[in-house]
Every structure is written in C-alpha cells, then in structure tokens.
Design a protein with these regions (language model features):
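Arg/Lys-rich, positively charged N-terminal/basic patches that mediate binding to nucleic acids
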Residues: 1-35
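Short, solvent-exposed helix-to-loop capping segments enriched in aromatics
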Residues: 41-50
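Short, hydrophobic secondary-structure boundary micro-motifs
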Residues: 29, 52-54, 95
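Enriched for short, Lys/Arg-rich terminal
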Residues: 67-71, 75-99
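Generic beta-structure capping elements
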Residues: 6-8, 19, 47, 86-89
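Σ70-family region 2.3-2.4 aromatic/basic alpha-helix that recognizes the −10 promoter
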Residues: 38
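Basic/aromatic recognition patch in beta-strand/loop cores that engages polyanionic ligands
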Residues: 49-79
Length: 99
C-alpha cells in the first residue's frame, strides 16, 4: 500500500523541522526527527490497522500512531493511508476536529 500526505500534514512536518532546527541549532537533529516520523508513514502504509482507532474521540475512520513526542493522525483508504496531521502529542488533538 501507499501513503499520501494532506496539506496539513506537510505543514506540520515543516513546523516540526523548523522548531527543532531553531531550538537545537542543528539541521541534522531536525532532519533525524522528521526522518523518524516519515519512516513511520511506510510502516503505516504496510500495516494500516496498527494505529489506535479514534472513532469515539475524533472522527469515525481515524487512527493515530505515536512517534516519540509526536502523533500521526491518519485514515485508512482503499489505496493506502492518508496522513492528515502530524502534531506534538501534548497538543489538544481533539481541537483539530472541533467545528
């Protein structure tokens, strides 16, 4: 199976990279963190049901998968997984889905 990134997921990865690069003053550290997250996209594409179901607290059909301090929010689709968001685990994830 394949994976695709929604615009919000792409923006989240960029935000994570810039934040880590600024705080650590190291592009290498930022690259490693983002690479560790994007590596999980391939895992999720091959094992799409590995993540925690979030039907009750977020929306039906959504799943989440932790990667260190971050959480990948995704949906399983017929042709793979759609990565919707990549956010810090401490963030109010439910707020992303409130009207």
């Amino acid at each position: 199976m394949a994976h695709r990134l929604a615009p919000a997921a792409e923006a989240g990865l960029e935000d994570i990279w810039y934040y880590i690069a600024k705080e650590s003053q190291s592009f290498e550290i930022a690259d490693r963190v983002v690479d560790s997250i994007t590596d999980r996209f391939f895992l999720l594409a091959n094992h799409p049901h590995i993540g925690r179901r979030r039907d009750e607290d977020l929306r039906p059909g959504l799943r989440s998968f932790p990667v260190g301090e971050y959480v990948i929010i995704y949906r399983v689709e017929d042709d793979g997984v759609l990565i919707l968001y990549v956010v810090r685990g401490s963030r109010d994830i439910e707020a992303l889905f409130r009207p």
